[in-house]
Amino acid sequence: MSNDQIKIIQNVVSGLHYAGVSEECKNNQEKANSKVRYIALGADHGGYEAKEIISRFLKNLGYHITDVGTYHRDSVDYPDFALKVAKKVASGECERGIMIDGAGIGSSMACNKVKGIRAALCYNLKTIINSREHNNANVLTLGGPLHNPEELCEMVKVWLETPFAGGRHWKRINKIMAIERGN
């Protein structure tokens, strides 16, 4: 997909943004959109090959990768690795996380059990962009076998480079955090 096509999708997904936002929201948005360098990366056996492809790709782009496993193709349980990725992000050790399993569904469920995590299962560029612009997702979950290597790399690159739009979306993020606090 060309850069022009990606821009068109970003413009369609982003919609209208409110001009008037509080100073606190502006500061939080700057933090949300600062250059991401540290990535937690994990997979179960179904996502192992995709994890290795993504790891090499991101290292070549200069990202610092914390690989939490798995380190082989033997059968393992995705919640174990999803929890490791989510904890690295929630603790601040890593700025974002990527978790890959066979379909991405179970990993998304597991990651979202960790306080402070907004994991998004994405399957195309539109959902990738939406997850960042509207939801400020800090963990991406993917179904590794569902995508070819080029798609995986493009999706990850766009996800890492797409900024949070802020504006009206802050209110929604705050509502998610209120649910998380039990309110």
Regions found by a protein language model. Name each.
Residues 62-65, 117-124:
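Short hydrophobic/aromatic-enriched beta-strand-loop microsegments
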Residues 64-75:
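A short beta-strand-loop structural module common to alpha/beta enzyme folds
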Residues 3-11, 16-19, 28-35, 42, ...:
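C-terminal binding/interaction regions
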Residues 100-119:
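Compact, glycine-rich, soluble single-domain proteins
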Residues 38, 95-98, 118-120, 137-141:
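Structural motif
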Residues 81-99:
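Short, structured active-site "lid" loops
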Residues 40-65:
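Glycine-rich phosphate/diphosphate-binding loop of Rossmann-like nucleotide-binding domains
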